[in-house]
Amino acid sequence: VTYPSYDNNELVNTFNNAYYNDLLQDGNTPLVNRPLKQKKASGSTFKMITALAGLETGTITPSTTIVDKGLFKDAGVPYARCWIYSNTGGTHGPVNVSHALEVSCNYFFYELGYRLGSTANGSDSNKAITTLNEYMAAFGLNDYTGVELDEYGPTMASPANKEKAVKTFNPDATTSQTRWTDGDTIRTAIGQSINSYTPAQITKYVS
């Protein structure tokens, strides 16, 4: 099932060329197979991966509490915002991982993504994204779904894919523009950054 819909009866038996041409010109692209050929950021569905990475690496425990301060400043400017701060100016206050998933607290997962890069000398954004990439791959977010239909492949947030994306728009981009940053990591941790998947890929991940 895909949306917007169209009348299949016009495209069988006596094929309606005029109707088909109208569909091709329709700005809503009704002929696009959206489950397999429309990619979007995974958004908050991704937070379960960040949670699992944090728990299995010992970065947090089920009882670890993080205080939502609204603006996450440790990754530099522009400061990342929790959705509730953007909408109301408020915060979720102290939350553990289960509560953070329940209320979809962005701040908790910014902090957790940042902590995944913790080292004796501070935060290492490459360490953090390497860990997240391992868990993304474990859930199949680095590969096609395997359905026997033509589909778009995933775009997994990673240093290599960031560099590729930046240079697509700016072939002369400098190293400072293409390098992976803490800001990229924390946005990846909530399913943003350059994460891009079809509905079918997200369905496979959560199934």
Feature roles, as predicted:
Residues 1-44, 49-207:
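Beta-lactam-recognizing serine transpeptidase/beta-lactamase-like catalytic domain environment
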